[in-house]
A protein has these predicted regions:
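A cross-family "folded-core" feature that marks the main globular domain of proteins
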Residues: 1-166
């Protein structure tokens, strides 16, 4: 077992890290739902949420309790999740929670096309970073958290629609 795998497994067992991940998916309406999902007592869940909340507040991220979700600067939230998944996982495919094969293929193809259209360096690190960021962005968008239009100014291009539909 590699040290990276040991570290990733340790993080995955941490209640605080499990809570942070659950907050991305926004599937728990309240503390009781979250505690049941993670097999923690409601009081331990609440203590962990308070601990997480105090750290998040320093970055301008707020924890909403009903429903449980993170709000604040969208770029900071997405970057936090990127850093979280980098620490948690040593393999890209272990990231994709509850995704079907065709969805994983779609993300992979979008990454491929994005690299090609923008003439980016095509290596494992670039693919991993883009894959993680697309996965996180899709979940955030699914839950109604959009990137502010004014912050979307970039020279990067998206692949043509017909290429994506193929």
């Amino acid at each position: 077992v590699s040290i990276n795998r040991l570290y990733a497994d340790t993080i995955q067992q941490s209640p605080e890290f499990q809570i942070i991940e659950e907050l991305l998916y926004e599937e728990c309406e309240n503390i009781i739902d979250l505690s049941k999902k993670l097999f923690l007592s409601p009081s331990k869940t609440q203590r962990n949420l308070k601990k997480i909340e105090s750290v998040l507040l320093k970055t301008g991220i707020t924890l909403q309790y009903r429903p449980l979700r993170l709000e604040g600067n969208e770029s900071v939230i997405r970057h936090m999740y990127y850093r979280y998944f980098i620490e948690k996982s040593d393999r890209l495919d272990s990231l994709y929670r509850d995704l079907k094969e065709f969805q994983i293929k779609a993300i992979t193809e979008l990454v491929n096309q994005f690299i090609q259209v923008n003439k980016l360096e095509d290596n494992y690190i670039s693919r991993k970073r883009l894959g993680y960021n697309m996965y996180i962005s899709l979940w955030r968008i699914k839950n109604g958290h959009y990137y502010p239009t004014l912050e979307l100014d970039s020279d990067l291009m998206l692949p043509e629609r017909q290429i994506l539909d193929a």
